């Protein structure tokens, strides 16, 4: 796994499923940054304080797409929460060596989608 960025990415999601903090800590670089529509370049310490507690809600990730572009891995997944709700996101992980240096999360939608096929909802994100 040491030099395979796709395996490193997969291992990070597996650590979330297992709630294995020591496994995820070994995969996250000291100079790590995390961004999402709600978070702007959180450092490693803040990421673990703010985001790691969400692992308690995650039951599983089903990978739709995992694509490598050099040191970057694009991951689209459907996640299942322990309460049975589901959602879909896409993430861009940057791998340096054998650790994750950066994650960008792009929020997707709930499953099932709240809009009918061919339609839309009237609420804004």
Protein language model features and the residues they cover:
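Short, low-complexity N-terminal intrinsically disordered segments enriched in polar/charged residues
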Residues: 1-22, 26, 30, 117-125
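Short, well-structured alpha-helical segments
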Residues: 25, 44, 48-49
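A beta-strand edge to alpha-helix "cap/lid" segment located at domain peripheries
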Residues: 4, 17, 35-37, 48-125
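Acidic-and-aromatic substrate-binding clefts and catalytic sites of carbohydrate-active enzymes
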Residues: 40-42
């Amino acid at each position: 796994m040491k030099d395979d960025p796709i395996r490193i990415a997969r291992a990070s999601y597996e650590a979330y499923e297992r709630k294995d903090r020591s496994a995820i800590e070994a995969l996250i670089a000291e100079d790590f940054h995390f961004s999402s529509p709600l978070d702007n370049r959180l450092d490693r310490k803040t990421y673990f304080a703010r985001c790691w507690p969400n692992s308690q809600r995650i039951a599983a990730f089903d990978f739709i797409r995992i694509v490598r572009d050099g040191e970057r891995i694009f991951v689209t997944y459907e996640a299942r929460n322990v309460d049975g709700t589901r959602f879909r996101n896409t993430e861009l992980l940057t791998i340096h060596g054998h650790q994750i240096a950066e994650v960008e999360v792009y929020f997707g939608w709930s499953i099932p989608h709240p809009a009918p096929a061919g339609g839309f909802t009237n609420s804004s994100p």
